[in-house]
Amino acid sequence: MPISVDKAVIARLKVHGETFEILVDPYLARDFKEGKEVPIEEILATPYVFKDAHKGDKASEKEMEKIFGTSDPYEVAKIILRKGEVQLTAQQRREMLEEKKRQIATIIHRHAVDPRTGYPHPVDRILRAMEEVGVRVDIFKDAEAQVQDVIKAIRRILPLRIEMKVIAVKIPSEYVGRAYGEVRKFGRIKKEEWASDGSWLFLIEIPGGVEEEFYEKLNALTKGNAQTKLIERKGL
C-alpha cells in the first residue's frame, strides 16, 4: 500500500530551467536510489508529477514529453528519483545515516580482521573509528559500494586486513540435512564430495571476520561432531 500524502516527502529534479516534483516514501525512495528493485507504484504517494507539489500544480503531459521524452508519470518519476534529490527531514536523514554507517561497519566486521590478532574488530569499534576520522557516508549509495573508501580512511587509526579463509570441513551423514543449507550462507563452496559413509566433505571460502561464527554454527548444527581444518588464508 502506497505511503499517505501527509507522510510522504518531495523528490525534486531541476532540468533545463524547469522544476519537477513527486511525493515519495522516503525509505523506498532511498532503496530505489541504491539500485534495489522497488516498484515505482509503491514508492509514489500519488501517481502524479508536479511543478510544485505544495501547491498541487501538476506538470502537463506536454511539459513531460518535452523534457523527458515521455508523458508516462511513472517513467518520469523514475528519472526524477535517479537524477534528483529527495528532501528528507532532519530526523529521517539522521536515522538513515546511522543505519548506513552500521551497515558499512558490519560488512567490514565480517570481511576484515585485525592483523595483530587475526580476529575481527567489533562493529562499535569500527563505528568509533569512522566517527573519529570523519568518514563521509552517502545515504543513497549502497553500503557495499562504500566499504573500500571507508576502509582506506579508517586504516590510519584502526589496523585492518581484508582476509578470506578456506576451510576443509567434514560433516557426518546424520547432520548433513540440517547443515547443508545453513553452511552455504557463510561463503562459497569451492569443492565438495561425498564419502562412502554418507559424510559431506567440502572446502568453503568465507570472509575472515566470520570464522568464529562459522565454527559456532557448525558445532550447533552437528552437536560438535564436525571436523574442520584451516587450509588457506588469503589477504585481499
From Swiss-Prot:
TM annotation in the entry: none
Alphabetical list of InterPro entries matching this protein = EFG_III/V, Ribosome_mat_SBDS_CS, Ribosome_mat_SBDS_N_sf, Sdo1/SBDS, Sdo1/SBDS-like, SDO1/SBDS_C, SDO1/SBDS_central, Sdo1/SBDS_central_sf
Domain of life of the native organism: Archaea
Pfam short name (any one):
SBDS_domain_II
What GO biological process terms does the UniProt entry carry, in alphabetical order?
Answer: cytosolic ribosome assembly
Family statement drawn from the similarity comment of this UniProt entry: Belongs to the SDO1/SBDS family.
What PANTHER family does the database record attribute to this sequence?
A: RIBOSOME MATURATION PROTEIN SBDS (PTHR10927), RIBOSOME MATURATION PROTEIN SDO1 HOMOLOG (PTHR10927:SF4)
Protein name as it appears in the record: Ribosome maturation protein SDO1 homolog
What species was this sequence derived from?
Pyrococcus abyssi (strain GE5 / Orsay)
